[in-house]
Every structure is written in structure tokens, then in C-alpha cells.
């Protein structure tokens, strides 16, 4: 997992435990979440924006009167995750013209660096015996962290005196 939604649900990358995009496996609810396969608790693999829907994590109503897409979660590196920029509706919102980097984030006033849910990436799946299909991925955090991991509590071992020693053993 790589973050937490403001609802308390845990965020996971686009790929599931079988290294298949969860969206392609049609195992997610309309809000981009599911109860983990193999007994895991509820978590989200995809952005849960729905324009007019009632099942989405956030909808058009969350944009009304706002200067920026709504806050939807935080990466475990402490960086905020905001909702998608809707392509044909949000040109007036702060940061709309600032491209997202490889981590799915950007920096602009007054927020500083932050992530955005994103729908700009395409994925083509080839399944034996079926035609290849290309679709847009509804990603939350892309999987890598832009934030300063050394500032995340307990992420690095302080006992060794080496701040670059990760607890994961690398």
C-alpha cells in the first residue's frame, strides 16, 4: 500500500497482487475500491471520481465554488493527494496548466508540491484468445514517492546512525 484516503481506506497501486491492473480484472466497485482478494481489508486501487454518481468518492459537487480539485488522501510520504483535473471543466482551477510529473504530482502556489489522481495514462492489455484492449487507467498515487521519505517517522532506521538505511533491508 502507498497511502490513505480521507475516508480511511488504504490506497494501493493500480496493479493487484497478481500483477494485473485491478480495473482490467473488473474487481473494483464504482468508487475504485474493493475488499482485498485473499481476505485483505477494504482498499482502493483506482480514482473514485464520478461526475454525477452517488457511489463515487467525490463528485462534481465537491468542485463547486472551489479553486482547486478536492483533497482525497495522502501518500505515506506525507504528500497530499487531490482529485483529478476534469479535462473540459477545470481550466480556471489553480494548477490546471501545470503538468504532472512522473510521480503524478506538481507544484504551484499556494499549495506547494502535491499529487493528483490521474486519468491520462493508457494501458493496453493482451489476453490470449482475445483482442488487445486499450483503456484509460484511473490512478491514485502512481506508486513511487516524490516526498522526502527520510522525514517519514520510522521509515529509516536511526539505530545504525545511518539515515539512509531503510527498514526494508536495502
Residue ranges and their predicted role:
Residues 1-42, 46-170:
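A motif-centric signal for short, conserved binding hotspots located
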Amino acid at each position: 500500500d502507498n497511502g490513505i484516503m480521507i475516508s480511511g481506506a488504504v490506497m494501493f497501486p493500480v496493479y493487484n497482487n497478481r500483477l494485473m491492473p485491478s480495473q482490467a480484472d473488473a474487481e473494483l466497485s464504482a468508487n475504485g475500491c474493493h475488499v482485498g482478494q485473499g481476505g485483505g481489508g477494504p482498499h482502493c486501487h483506482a480514482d473514485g471520481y464520478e461526475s454525477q454518481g452517488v457511489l463515487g468518492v467525490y463528485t462534481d459537487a465537491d468542485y463547486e465554488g472551489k479553486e482547486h480539485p478536492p483533497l482525497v488522501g495522502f501518500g505515506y510520504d506525507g504528500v497530499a493527494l487531490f482529485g483529478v483535473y476534469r479535462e473540459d471543466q477545470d481550466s480556471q482551477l489553480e494548477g490546471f496548466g501545470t503538468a504532472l510529473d512522473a510521480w503524478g504530482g506538481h507544484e504551484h502556489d499556494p499549495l506547494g508540491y502535491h499529487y493528483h489522481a490521474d486519468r491520462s495514462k493508457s494501458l493496453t492489455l493482451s489476453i490470449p484468445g482475445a483482442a488487445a484492449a486499450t483503456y484509460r487507467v484511473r490512478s491514485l498515487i502512481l506508486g513511487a514517492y516524490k516526498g522526502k521519505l527520510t522525514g517519514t517517522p520510522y521509515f529509516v532506521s536511526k539505530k545504525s546512525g545511518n539515515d539512509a538505511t531503510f527498514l526494508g533491508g536495502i
